[in-house]
């Protein structure tokens, strides 16, 4: 089977507070053989912009991310597990974690909530049956999925995604300085490939995740704008791109650990665009 070929028997497992322990036990087994983890999150948009003076546009972009991640709560996390060949485990390949979120009490951008509601996210169920992030963090820390150099993380334009995960795992606000953020990032996620960053070296590939998937002739499983389906599509895109553009080998020195839109590798930093993360927050569209 070619890498990342769609197999419709693959299932996305919905995880709520009631089945979290059971599903994390399965993940602790799966990660032993399927050490590529494609990840996506859903979060409630962008609600704030930093004020004051900034050393550079790069500094502004990170402060924009930081102030929004600090203020807001994650809604969903999708994790898809694959092996070196891009193959899935038998049965469930993707776990979609649904976190506690209250539309009455928690902050959000209205347009983001409308998009997620249209996409099938059940906010009433998130309020009543959602996972507590602190307990999830305890389970994730001992799962073998984070803090492990043998695990390779796959993502798409993922500054916000990793920002929310670091906030959960440290149970604290993000560090004030971007360099400190990347130090923590490397601790929890030693190997990261951001598909959007890889696209810089892929002739004619452009756009958001859905557009890229269509260019690569990949077929989505599950609903768009939900973290499980998006993580699965991200993993499929990585392996298809690795085969088509990188001769099945990614140069770690050039690509590992770079997040598109953050740090010195950011095209936004270089061209001075001020709304990098507004775009990222709407990257699902």
Swiss-Prot record:
Its EC number is 3.1.13.4. It catalyses: Exonucleolytic cleavage of poly(A) to 5'-AMP. GO terms for molecular function: 3'-5'-RNA exonuclease activity; DNA-binding transcription factor binding; metal ion binding; piRNA binding; poly(A)-specific ribonuclease activity; RNA exonuclease activity; transcription corepressor activity. InterPro entries: CNOT7/CNOT8/Pop2 (IPR039637), RNase_CAF1 (IPR006941), RNaseH-like_sf (IPR012337), RNaseH_sf (IPR036397). It is found in: Nucleus; Cytoplasm, P-body; Cytoplasm, Cytoplasmic ribonucleoprotein granule. Changing residue 225 to A: Abolishes RNA deadenylase activity. A divalent metal cation 1 binds at residues 40, 161, 278. Keywords: Cytoplasm, Exonuclease, Hydrolase, Magnesium, Metal-binding, Nuclease, Nucleus, Repressor, RNA-binding, RNA-mediated gene silencing, Transcription, Transcription regulation, Translation regulation. Its cofactor is Mn(2+); Mg(2+); Co(2+). Changing residue 42 to Q: Abolishes RNA deadenylase activity. GO terms for biological process: deadenylation-dependent decapping of nuclear-transcribed mRNA; defense response to virus; miRNA-mediated gene silencing by mRNA destabilization; negative regulation of cell population proliferation; negative regulation of DNA-templated transcription; negative regulation of gene expression; negative regulation of type I interferon-mediated signaling pathway; nuclear-transcribed mRNA catabolic process, deadenylation-dependent decay. Binds 2 divalent metal cations per subunit with RNAase activity being higher in presence of Mn(2+) than of Mg(2+) or Co(2+). A divalent metal cation 2 binds at residues 40, 42, 230. GO terms for cellular component: CCR4-NOT complex; CCR4-NOT core complex; cytoplasm; cytosol; intracellular membraneless organelle; membrane; nuclear body; nuclear speck. Changing residue 161 to N: Abolishes RNA deadenylase activity. Drastically reduces the rate of deadenylation and decay of CBEP3-tethered mRNA. Has 3'-5' poly(A) exoribonuclease activity for synthetic poly(A) RNA substrate. Its function seems to be partially redundant with that of CNOT8. Catalytic component of the CCR4-NOT complex which is one of the major cellular mRNA deadenylases and is linked to various cellular processes including bulk mRNA degradation, miRNA-mediated repression, translational repression during translational initiation and general transcription regulation. During miRNA-mediated repression the complex also seems to act as translational repressor during translational initiation. Component of the CCR4-NOT complex; distinct complexes seem to exist that differ in the participation of probably mutually exclusive catalytic subunits; the complex contains two deadenylase subunits, CNOT6 or CNOT6L, and CNOT7 or CNOT8. In the complex, interacts directly with CNOT1. Interacts with AGO2. Interacts with TOB1; recruited by TOB1 to a ternary complex with CPEB3 which is required for mRNA deadenylation and decay. Interacts with BTG1. Interacts with BTG2. Interacts with NANOS2. Belongs to the CAF1 family. This is CCR4-NOT transcription complex subunit 7. It comes from Homo sapiens. The gene is CNOT7.
């Amino acid at each position: 089977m070619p890498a990342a070929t769609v197999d419709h028997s693959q299932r996305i497992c919905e995880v709520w507070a009631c089945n979290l322990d059971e599903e994390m036990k399965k993940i602790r087994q799966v990660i032993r053989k399927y050490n590529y983890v494609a990840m996506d999150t859903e979060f409630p948009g962008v609600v704030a912009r930093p004020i004051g003076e900034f050393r550079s546009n790069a500094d502004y972009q990170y402060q924009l991310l930081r102030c929004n991640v600090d203020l807001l709560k994650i809604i969903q996390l999708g994790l898809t597990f694959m092996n070196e060949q891009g193959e899935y485990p038998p049965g469930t390949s993707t776990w979609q974690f649904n976190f506690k979120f209250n539309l009455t009490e928690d902050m959000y951008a209205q347009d983001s909530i409308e998009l997620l509601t249209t996409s099938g996210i059940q906010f009433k169920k998130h309020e009543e049956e959602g996972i507590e992030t602190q307990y999830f963090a305890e389970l994730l820390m001992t799962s073998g999925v984070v803090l492990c150099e043998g695990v390779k993380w796959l993502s798409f334009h993922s500054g916000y995604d990793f920002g929310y995960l670091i906030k959960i795992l440290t149970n604290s606000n993000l560090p004030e300085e971007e360099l400190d953020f990347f130090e923590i990032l490397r601790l929890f996620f030693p190997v990261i490939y951001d598909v959007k960053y890889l696209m810089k070296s892929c002739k004619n590939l452009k756009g958001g995740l859905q557009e890229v998937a269509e260019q690569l002739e990949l077929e989505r499983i599950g609903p768009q704008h939900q973290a499980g389906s998006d993580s699965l599509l991200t993993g499929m895109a990585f392996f298809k791109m690795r085969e088509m553009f990188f001769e099945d080998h990614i140069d770690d020195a050039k690509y590992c650990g770079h997040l598109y839109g953050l740090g010195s590798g950011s095209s936004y930093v270089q061209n001075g665009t001020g709304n990098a993360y507004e775009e990222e927050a709407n990257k699902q569209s």
